[in-house]
Amino acid sequence: VIERYTLPEMGNLWSEAYKLKTWLQVEIAVCEAQAELGYIPSEAVAKIKAKANFDPKRVLEIEAEVRHDMIAFLTNVNEYVGDAGRYIHLGLTSSDVLDTALALQLIASLDLLLQRLEDLIQAIRHKAREHRYTVMIGRSHGIHAEPMTFGFKLAGWLAEVLRHQERLQILQKTIAVGKISGAVGTYANIEPRVEVIACQKLGLKPDTASTQVISRDIHGDYVQQLALVAASIERFAVEIRNLQKTDVLEVEEFFAKGQKGSSAMPHKRNPIRSERLTGIARLVRSHASAVLENVALWHERDMSHSSVERVVLPDACILTHFMIHEITDLVTNLLVYPQNMERNLNCYGGVVFSQRVLLTLIDKGLNREEAYAIVQQSAHTAWNKPEGNFRDLISKDPRVTQKLSPPEIDACFDPQYHLRHLDQVYQRLGI
């Protein structure tokens, strides 16, 4: 990922140095396990732990010659360790180290993602509480529907993010799998107990039945969960974009002092951060497709997944982390305009209260078809005229006034009627 969308803490987890660090962690854990079981001398392990190191530049130099990154790494480590290095990688295949170390990177990435997600949860919770009773129009198909509150909209966002939090917490357990089982996974040259002990030292569980690699359905699940997070963030961003349209302007991205919106038009205040998130979500979604292609490896392994994962796994983690950070800041500093919400709610003279009028007429004895025709006629008349006023039309329709008194008509246009159950939703979410 380009630096523009990389936050330092997540970028560090996917650096070459950090990757090699996890490789060394795995190699040392295996050595310790073998020593505990008496397969290699404890003195050798002590020397390995004291001297083992690596130089990323040197590893690349060696790789340019041998064309194998794991061999290059082991060669470089042995340059530091000396004779005790012959016990490193004993009975292992490259994927034992690669897949087990990858699990460590993915777990560390999840920890950061969950930290950021908690920040987002708190930001949405605070904003939802602040605008619990900020009345606005709800829309379906992009068309005015019925009254709601901005806080209620945010409550829906919160519920969605809480589901993501739960899924990522489950994913922490799913991805925490290592394999130290050798070529094709048969433990031919390494004791299964070594795998158990080494994985325990690394905070992992042994894969139940690995081949030469850990099955890629696990990694497919991982990126799909990140793609779901990205999709929700995109939904929030698209909502901000739609509500920031000039003729709507119910919310707006914070516009900093000195910020410019357009090189040509000085008046512009564009929702550029929300647009950026919309674009990045497309990338993360595309990565979910790529990792699914990795599941169908040949026999006990091939290497077709490797090139994909070198790009997709870091990118998915880095981009999702950036997206969570960005949407958290957007929500925290979002400008909300209740007066514009009220203006939009009341345009066309309260036409959005049509269902309330309909149901009240039915309650007064009209059949549904007749009541619907009466209300629709006034609603469409108001809708099709610039100065149309649904409330006035209803109040002057004798078919309505025969059934409803003026106070009963007024009651149909009270937005509070639509909000009377919202507290139950807030209680469910603990807002």
Task: Please report, for each region that a protein language model flagged, where it lies by residue.
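Active-site-adjacent "gating/activation" loops or surface patches in catalytic cores
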Residues: 195-212, 216
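Amphipathic alpha-helices that form helix-helix packing interfaces
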Residues: 30-33, 113, 117-120, 124-127, ...
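Alpha-helical support elements that line or immediately flank enzyme active sites
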Residues: 32, 105-117, 226-235, 240, ...
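Glycine-rich anion/phosphate-binding loop at the beta-strand->alpha-helix junction
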Residues: 164, 213-305, 310
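A helix-coil-helix interface module used to build multimeric assemblies
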Residues: 1-187, 191-197, 206, 259-262, ...
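Conserved hydrophobic residue
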Residues: 40, 248-249, 367
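Glycine-rich cofactor/substrate-binding loops
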Residues: 1-22, 62-66, 83, 265-431
